[in-house]
């Protein structure tokens, strides 16, 4: 079902109903771009740590816009042994609600726009008819504006005319406004004396003059009139005064309050759908979904925190249970029988032996998708086939039980090992980002960090390391790369070869990481020392409170890269070979290591705790057991 601004309100109850009755959801997003600077290859280096990958995506991807959101709900019909689906395709755009609303700025990537256009994407539905939204801070600010407005005019929203914050004594009116107020009072006196006229429209005036009018009338006419501010077609604000009895005045105030609440809900817009998904506590499925999750949290909840651990805490607060089908398909027992994990190819493979495609039917009134026609890169369709892939793989796990089960539900312990682990694209030895604990820290004692002139190409690196047999190269930027050797014993020899070289330098991966950690510590120490110097000065000034602001990244350039979508990025053959070769022997001590530079408390963690407080009434459908299933655990080694 296609949802745009004009039919969003009329169909919102259908969305809520679908979410409420579903067993699980599948989601997908389409964006205005992927990377504002680095190429996709540089953005997804094979030896990124989870922290580095998060920082790259946060810096280079979050200024793009998620402008199409696909949601497909799945409910199992036990009578007919089939799934009933409801698919929604939302077009989203941050239309300013009023003059004080945030005017969102975002960037576009030409290759991404060109690719979506080639797939028949209708951009008019985004820019002309996209559903507005607000994040939680913007919603809070808008609510405060409404509360302040009601406080000035109608007693903070109470039905009594006089505000408890408004003086019941005569108002002090500036000399230059006395004539204006006297004229208004005179017109109101004429209105009250007239038997024919019921309403009086005052001329448009300034906000200060309207405030004086409200204050004067609340003191002079506590009963008998109703005062309301309206807007002309030219956006000029004016006051309408009506003669009413007390019952009619209360009725109008109730209508006005209901209208304001409706306007507020309209401004929150699509965020209400995301809140409903989050508050359900149900399993959310995605394919290669790290970017989808980051954009969803960033766009509809709050800006992403600087620290990865804070992002994890925030994400699990919003979405208690996530499952990535790309990771699932890349893990045993699927890894050996699924060669290509891109979404389109995965959907095709799961129709073949040993898998059984699920029996699926669209709910009445909802359009059905034909997978033979492949409507890829329509978010609703991608969400639909993502859900199909999950069902097929989950049911396949049931075949290992004794006796075998043909249907494995979204609440089954068989799929718990895959919860809250998001696939890391192209990382050779860390398959996933673990949202519920420390990330894997594999040994990289066979990896070298190499710096070299900008003119060098891949062939130059192969020539440099020709004496060391098979190698794998992962470019970092134009002047550096990681090179992995086939044997760790060769590393000291390779490092020694660069001792007297002028054009290049080779160091071990451990040395590279150690120097980066030192730089990070020095930078933080400098920041802390600077703060110690600033703090006394702040206390001695009268310039108000000082607060650290979030750092907002802006695109310095729009680099048109090759036409690539996040769905069809699969590990290269070389990377796959190294992935299979990696020993991955990780000790418990290594797994428990955390970043020694991590701050104990920060703005991001405060936001996560705030989200938890807002969701204290959450009643998830189903529960997550602390004990993982013994079968098919996502491996600690890759």
Swiss-Prot record:
Record-level Gene Ontology MF annotations: 3'-5'-RNA exonuclease activity; cation binding; metal ion binding; poly(A)-specific ribonuclease activity; RNA binding
Enzyme Commission no: 3.1.13.4
Reaction(s) catalysed by this chain's protein: Exonucleolytic cleavage of poly(A) to 5'-AMP
Cell compartment(s), UniProt: Nucleus; Cytoplasm; Nucleus, Nucleolus
Chain spans, region Disordered: 143-165, 573-638
Modification note: Phosphorylation by MAPKAPK2, preventing GADD45A mRNA degradation after genotoxic stress.
Site residues (Interaction with poly(A)), renumbered to this chain: 326
One GO BP: nuclear-transcribed mRNA poly(A) tail shortening
Phosphoserine modification, residue list: 163, 167, 530, 557, 583, 587, 619, 623, 627
Keyword RNA-binding listed: yes
Cofactor, free-text remark: Divalent metal cations. Mg(2+) is the most probable.
Modified residues (N6-acetyllysine): 220, 499
Cofactor(s), names only, from the UniProt record: Mg(2+)
Summary of subunit composition and partner proteins: Homodimer. Found in a mRNA decay complex with RENT1, RENT2 and RENT3B. Interacts with KHSRP. Interacts with CELF1/CUGBP1. Interacts with ZC3HAV1 in an RNA-independent manner. Interacts with DHX36.
Family to which the UniProt record says this protein belongs: Belongs to the CAF1 family.
Function, as annotated: 3'-exoribonuclease that has a preference for poly(A) tails of mRNAs, thereby efficiently degrading poly(A) tails. Exonucleolytic degradation of the poly(A) tail is often the first step in the decay of eukaryotic mRNAs and is also used to silence certain maternal mRNAs translationally during oocyte maturation and early embryonic development. Involved in nonsense-mediated mRNA decay, a critical process of selective degradation of mRNAs that contain premature stop codons.
Protein name, UniProt field: Poly(A)-specific ribonuclease PARN
Organism (species): Bos taurus (Bovine)
Gene name in the database record: PARN
């Amino acid at each position: 079902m296609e949802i745009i601004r004009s039919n969003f309100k009329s169909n919102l109850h259908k969305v809520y109903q679908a979410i409420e009755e579903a067993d699980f959801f599948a989601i997908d997003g389409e964006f205005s771009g992927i990377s504002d600077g680095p190429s996709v290859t540089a953005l997804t280096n094979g030896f990124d740590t989870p922290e580095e990958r998060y920082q790259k995506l946060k810096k280079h991807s979050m200024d793009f816009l998620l402008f199409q959101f696909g949601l497909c709900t799945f409910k199992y019909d036990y009578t007919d042994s089939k799934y009933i689906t409801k698919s929604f395709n939302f077009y989203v755009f941050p239309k300013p609600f009023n003059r004080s609303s945030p005017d969102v700025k975002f960037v576009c990537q030409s290759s991404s726009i060109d690719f979506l256009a080639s797939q028949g994407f209708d951009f008019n539905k985004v820019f002309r008819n996209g559903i507005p939204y607000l994040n939680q801070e913007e919603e809070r600010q808008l609510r405060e504006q409404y509360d302040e407005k009601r406080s000035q005019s109608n007693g903070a929203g109470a039905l009594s005319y006089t505000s408890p914050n408004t003086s019941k004594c005569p108002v002090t009116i500036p000399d230059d406004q006395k004539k204006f107020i006297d004229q208004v009072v005179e017109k109101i006196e004429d209105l009250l004396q007239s038997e024919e006229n019921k309403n009086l429209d005052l001329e448009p005036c300034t906000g200060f003059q309207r405030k004086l009018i409200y204050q004067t009338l609340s003191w002079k006419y506590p009963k008998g009139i109703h005062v309301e501010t309206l807007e002309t077609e030219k956006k000029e604000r004016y006051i309408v005064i009506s003669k009413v009895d007390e019952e009619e005045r209360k009725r109008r105030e109730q209508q006005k309050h209901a209208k304001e609440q409706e306007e507020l809900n309209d401004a929150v817009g699509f965020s209400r759908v995301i809140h409903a998904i989050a508050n359900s506590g149900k399993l959310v499925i995605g394919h290669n979904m790290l970017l989808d999750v980051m954009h969803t949290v960033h766009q509809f909840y709050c800006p992403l925190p600087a620290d990865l651990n804070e992002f994890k805490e925030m994400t699990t607060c919003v979405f208690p249970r996530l499952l990535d089908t790309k990771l699932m398909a890349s893990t045993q027992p699927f890894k050996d029988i699924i060669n290509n994990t891109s979404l389109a190819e995965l959907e095709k493979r799961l129709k073949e032996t040993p898998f059984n495609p699920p029996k699926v039917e669209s709910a009445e009134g909802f359009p059905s998708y034909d997978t033979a026609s492949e409507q890829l890169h329509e978010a609703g369709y991608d969400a639909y086939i993502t859900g199909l892939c999950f069902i097929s793989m989950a049911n396949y796990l049931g075949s290992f039980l004794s006796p075998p089960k043909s249907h494995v539900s979204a609440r089954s312990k068989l799929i718990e090992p895959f919860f809250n682990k998001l696939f890391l694209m192209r990382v050779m030895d860390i398959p996933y980002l673990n949202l519920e604990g420390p990330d894997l820290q594999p040994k990289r004692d066979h990896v070298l960090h190499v710096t070299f002139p900008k003119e060098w190409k891949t062939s130059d690196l192969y020539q440099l390391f020709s004496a060391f047999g098979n190698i794998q190269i992962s470019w970092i930027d134009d002047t550096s790369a990681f090179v992995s050797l086939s044997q760790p014993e060769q590393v000291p020899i390779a490092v020694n070869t660069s001792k007297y070289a002028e054009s290049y330098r080779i160091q071990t991966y451990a040395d590279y990481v150690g120097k980066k950690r030192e730089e990070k510590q020095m930078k933080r120490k400098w920041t802390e020392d600077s703060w110690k110097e600033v703090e006394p000065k702040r206390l001695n000034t009268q310039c108000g409170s000082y607060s650290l602001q979030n750092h907002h990244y802006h695109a310095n350039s729009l680099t048109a890269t090759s036409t690539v979508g996040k769905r069809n990025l699969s590990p290269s053959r070389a990377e796959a070979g190294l992935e299979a070769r990696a020993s991955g022997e990780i000790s418990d001590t290594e797994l428990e290591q955390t970043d020694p530079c991590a701050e104990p408390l920060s703005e991001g963690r405060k936001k996560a705790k705030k989200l938890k407080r807002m969701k204290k009434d959450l009643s998830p459908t189903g529960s997550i057991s602390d004990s993982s299933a013994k079968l098919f655990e996502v491996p600690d080694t890759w």
